[in-house]
Amino acid sequence: MNKRTLIVRTVALAAVLAAGGALAQDKPLKIGVTAGPHAQIFEQVKKVAERDGLKIQVIEFSDYVQPNAALSAGDLDANSYQHKPYLDQQVKDRGYRIVPVGYTVNFPIGIYSKKVKSLAELKEGSRVGIPNDPTNGGRVLLVFQDKGLIKLRADAGLKATPLDVVDNPRKIRFVEVDAAQLPRTLDDLDASAVNTNYALPAGLNPGRDAIAQESAKSPYVNLLAVREQDKDKPWVAKLVKAYQSDEVRRFVQTEFKGAVVPGF
């Protein structure tokens, strides 16, 4: 073997090894979630994904705004905490190039109270806390409309706000509050609508404690999201497969007993 041949083969071997290294995961994927059920579920996803060679670092956030900001900035590889109406609004408002890549779970929103046992008991002028973002606030207003307590403009859609209320016989006052803070308002307000991912850590279970609950067939199934430039990368398909596995489905059904339901 002459020197030239040896050099060529050495270079070729180095290229093969480099390619193999490129296929291997150099560092864990950073996945942003909100604290509570999303974090609990992703710890199970992490175990399933690791068997497929995918390393994951779960990073918890305490609000709905930062996970998309961090993903857009490149500080996360994906996030798992929001439904499509919320993501669509964020993309519209902030110009994010973030796309959904797979469905995860649904959190039927519940309405809770320490003062009344049903929506029918709400008196004239009652104050009700709702999330201050349009998509989740709209969810609550639709529940109140479905229960016959208010009427919304015909074209209000999924992102209705208190300004879209056109008939309100009991003059219910909807108080917009950051979603994460709503469990703390129950001592002061007549009722509050709390997203399940914030309700469960606060000791509230929609199946047991809610005085009213959104239908499980609502359009608010949560999703996995990534930057648009990453959506076709191999790790994305592996991540979705891990989340939508039978093992994760069984965990959700067993752990949350209907408070959180699989959406895949």
Feature map (PLM): residue ranges:
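Pocket-flanking alpha-helical
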Residues: 64-95, 110-117, 137-140, 199-203
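Short helix-initiation/N-cap motifs at beta->coil->alpha
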Residues: 58-69, 156-184
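Periplasmic-binding protein-like
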Residues: 103-112, 136-145, 200-264
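Ligand-binding "clamshell"
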Residues: 89-101, 116, 188, 193, ...
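Beta->alpha turn/N-cap motifs
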Residues: 36, 60-64, 74, 79-88, ...
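Short, well-ordered beta-strand elements
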Residues: 25-36, 56-60, 127-128
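A conserved helix-loop-strand patch within extracytoplasmic ligand-binding domains
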Residues: 101-151
